[in-house]
């Protein structure tokens, strides 16, 4: 991940140049991530330009950025969210166990924490992927029922009206009690989220879109020759994001354009990454291992990723996890020619005996392809 490296331009430069010959043998590098940020509309053009420079004859690099094939929607519970790793103040909260609400409240109760958080929130010069426009932050779950489905901006304006003497701004006794609990006057916008996090912690669940909300720009990124579809980062996060359907969404983006674009998307998801990493996969060759996925094109056309996210309990984690459920889209999966999914349930063999193989680099054919 390159996100933290951009805070130091020297480290940023040295890191990227390792993919070329300036430091000896090129390091094959797949970096996170090429994005179209919602609050900085020009940034997306930099990623293809950087990758193109590194892969030029001058640098002779082996480099690509990964691209997420859908709007990058991220969820937060209180301040439990990867985006808050960008703030020195809230990194203290991220270091606490997710179930340790008491520890987070002790940290947030201090005046030093509040001052630092509000200062960081309003630091316009900070390098950040977080769009801090309150109207772009949407409340999904909250003890105040009236706020569910609203933005923080709407709550902020209602609070300002209430504190200006408009008691009628409260729509229920519960909302009146919540509004009365805020510091009066509320002051800066950052103080709103600070108070809500202190009061509700993980009972406040909200979401925002970090990037990739413009379909025409997203398609350009997905099919740029120096970038590859990827960044389906779900396995690293339990409750904050779910993009397990990222490869299906790449096909969906292509499907909206043409059948030829779908064929190109299949190549982008299989042959191109296999050749980049030098592994023996992703090609329709006689005698190759038959790993096959069958997709229903009409079900894919109708699939809505935002409507099919679910929070489910996972025994393996002993915790809930945000997942995607693309029921009906994938009708069959074969590993080495053996069917392991029939569109309704998994085969008994899956997870009980060996079906596939490790994908390792090094065969003569893949060395030639990766050269």
Where are these regions (language model features)?
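C-terminal helical cap
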Residues: 173-219, 250-300
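Generic beta-strand/beta-sheet core signal
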Residues: 30-32, 65-70, 230-233, 287, ...
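Polyanionic/metal-chelating signatures
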Residues: 3-232
